[in-house]
Amino acid sequence: MSFDKKLLEIVACPVCKGKLDYDKAKQQLICKLDRLAYPINDGIPVLLENKAESWEEA
């Protein structure tokens, strides 16, 4: 199952409530403000702070 990009209109970072960006290659949602990456498992975003990984822009 793939991630539905329409979800980006309604989901937000659980930490700062900011906008999330989709990283298709890594299957993650990125919060650039908090520098966190949230995994997407089987097309479902896991928006739990304890599941987020540190993110750095390439």
From Swiss-Prot:
GO cellular component, one term: cytosol
Coiled-coil region(s): none
Superkingdom: Bacteria
Family label: Belongs to the UPF0434 family.
Protein name as annotated: UPF0434 protein Swoo_1821
Natural source organism: Shewanella woodyi (strain ATCC 51908 / MS32)
Lineage: Bacteria, Pseudomonadati, Pseudomonadota, Gammaproteobacteria, Alteromonadales
